[in-house]
A protein has these predicted regions:
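Active-site-proximal loop/turn and secondary-structure-junction residues that shape catalytic pockets
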Residues: 16-18, 60-64, 86-91, 134-138, ...
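Histidine-acidic metal/acid-base catalytic patches
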Residues: 1-17, 24-27, 44, 142, ...
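Glycine-rich, aromatic-flanked loop segments that form ligand/cofactor-binding clefts
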Residues: 7-17, 60-90
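Catalytic domains of carbohydrate-active enzymes, especially glycoside hydrolases
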Residues: 3-12, 29-62
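Active-site acidic/histidine proton-transfer and metal-coordination neighborhood
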Residues: 4, 82, 94-200, 204, ...
Length: 393
């Protein structure tokens, strides 16, 4: 089980290390990064203690710099690499009524050009994925032409996709509501799947675990998209009500376990052209990323805890006796099949995962090791003055 954890790599979002909050308040914290370089340094610290977070995702324009080659070199010096490039078409006044779906061709072209600029950044950073999440939608029935907006979205995505390189991908994220309340232009996995399927093999779906209605069977969506070869990436977080962006696994660790079981079942950790059960299929080169906002808790420990939660639920999912499970399923043994799954879920894997870390020269307890490292006190003393990174900065 532990050897298979070597395949687990969790990308960290640069914005998780900046200040964030709610529509009521954004709280500042000592030591918060003021530059993208300081965000990368914090992300590299998470990787140094966990060994499972080798890349950092950037958000444009929040993380815009003049020299991306130099930024990549800075990241490499700190033991990580630059990863997914995330676009932003939700913080400009021109996008009040939409971006890629806007009725005004000039606004649509502005949004398209932003994504082309993101692809240019990818060419400089060596990033594989361009991630698109759109706030586009409407608040009232009749406000917009639902079908017309889908047509414009398809045209805009096609204009972007033709610039995606042979070794690059576009991933389209969906969200069932917010900020739009009546109709969101990419509200569900079906819409994302339809749009990316029309583009080509290098267009995939991004699944954010907090972007579903309560009670949604997310692991079914995972299984289906992996089956179709269209699940490109995850945004991991946790939620109690809506898109809460809490630490992954905090609200429902059993759900995270079930998701990771289907990821493993579909070959999502292998990144090769066949499924782990040997049945063939599209396989996956799946990206696992955190997308969280640490509004009240400390940011670096919050990211460490998140990585540990994914690792531990993955380890539990790897313990499922799949042969016994298949036999019970084929025999119609309802309770037996459920029991096999639950036995794995209830197994305490923390000692085994700790051994995995120590065998690789990592601390057995990353949370404690970070707390004792003095890193937070050091950056709190050093990062005085300037403007702390936050939404839009």
């Amino acid at each position: 089980m532990t050897a298979q954890l070597d395949d687990l790599a969790i990308e960290l979002p640069s914005w998780a290390f900046g200040n964030s909050g709610t529509r009521f308040k954004v709280f500042g914290t000592p030591g918060t990064p003021r530059t993208v370089e300081e965000k990368i340094a914090d992300a590299a610290t998470v990787h140094r203690f966990t060994g499972m977070a080798p890349t950092v995702a950037l958000h444009i324009p929040w993380d815009r710099v003049d020299d991306y080659a130099a930024l990549g070199a800075f990241a490499a010096e700190h033991g990580v690499a630059l990863g997914t490039i995330n676009s932003n078409t939700f913080q400009d006044d021109d996008y009040k009524f939409g971006s890629l779906t806007h009725v005004d061709k000039t606004v649509r072209q502005k949004a398209i050009d932003h994504h082309l600029a993101c692809i240019d950044i990818m060419n400089q950073t060596g990033s594989r994925d361009l991630k698109i999440w759109l706030a586009d939608g409407t608040n009232y029935p009749g406000q917009g032409d639902i079908r017309g907006r889908q047509d414009r979205l398809a045209e805009s995505l096609a204009a972007i996709y033709q610039h995606v390189g042979d070794d690059q991908r576009m991933v389209l994220e969906y969200k069932f509501f917010e900020p739009a309340m009546y109709m969101t232009d990419v509200p569900d996995w079906g819409t994302s799947f339809v749009q990316v399927s029309a583009l080509g093999e290098r267009a995939k779906v991004c699944l954010d675990t907090g972007h579903h209605a309560p009670g949604t069977n997310i692991e079914f969506i995972v299984a289906q998209l992996l089956r179709l070869g269209k699940l490109g990436s995850f945004d991991f977080n946790s939620r109690f009500y809506a898109d809460d962006d809490l630490i992954v696994g905090a609200a429902d660790p059993f759900q995270l376990f079930r998701i990771m079981f289907e990821v493993i079942r579909g070959g999502g950790l292998e990144g090769r052209g066949e499924r782990s059960d040997g049945e063939g299929g599209a396989g996956s080169d799946l990206a696992l990323m955190l997308d969280q906002c640490h509004n009240v808790e400390a940011k670096i420990p919050g990211q460490i805890r998140s990585v540990l939660n994914v690792a531990e639920m993955t380890a539990r999912a790897l313990l499922v006796d799949t042969d016994a499970l298949a036999a019970a399923q084929e025999a119609g043994d309802v309770l037996g099949a459920n029991g096999i799954l639950m036995d794995a879920f209830y197994t305490d894997v923390r000692p085994a995962v700790a051994r995995w870390r120590t065998d690789r020269g990592l601390p057995a307890d990353p949370m404690r090791a970070f707390a004792e490292s003095g890193y937070q006190d050091a950056v709190s003393a050093e990062r005085v003055g300037g403007t702390q990174s936050s939404w839009g900065a």
